[in-house]
Amino acid sequence: MTTESLETLVEQLSGLTVLELSQLKKLLEEKWDVTAAAPVVAVAGAAAAGDAPASAEPTEFAVILEDVPSDKKIGVLKVVREVTGLALKEAKEMTEGLPKTVKEKTSKSDAEDTVKKLQEAGAKAVAKGL
């Protein structure tokens, strides 16, 4: 591929929504028969010696939508649209086939606010540190 075509590809990928990126990830995993799970690495040196804190507080969080009762879908759908800026169709898809990541790489306070809004609408949602 030429540099120009790679730049075009990067521009196209940059324009995708979170939902579209999630779908792309699934398609690539199926096509290449791989998973996007991070490898587990055993770290013995510095952590065992006490040079690093045992558990550092994460600075980035992901908001995971785990469950939406059928009688609460419309309210949750409105909140998903509000917090993500997705169109109606994409937001509806986000509330189906759970769990789904609603937001990624967001601050702790933003993640907590988003979880609170989703829970107030009737959904089961959690914030997980990245």
UniProtKB/Swiss-Prot annotation:
The keyword Metal-binding does not apply. Gene3D superfamilies: 3.30.1390.10, Single helix bin. Keywords: Ribonucleoprotein, Ribosomal protein. GO terms for cellular component: cytosolic large ribosomal subunit. GO terms for biological process: translation. GO terms for molecular function: mRNA binding; structural constituent of ribosome. Homodimer. Part of the ribosomal stalk of the 50S ribosomal subunit. Forms a multimeric L10(L12)X complex, where L10 forms an elongated spine to which 2 to 4 L12 dimers bind in a sequential fashion. Binds GTP-bound translation factors. Forms part of the ribosomal stalk which helps the ribosome interact with GTP-bound translation factors. Is thus essential for accurate translation. Belongs to the bacterial ribosomal protein bL12 family. NCBIfam families: L12. This is Large ribosomal subunit protein bL12. The gene is rplL.
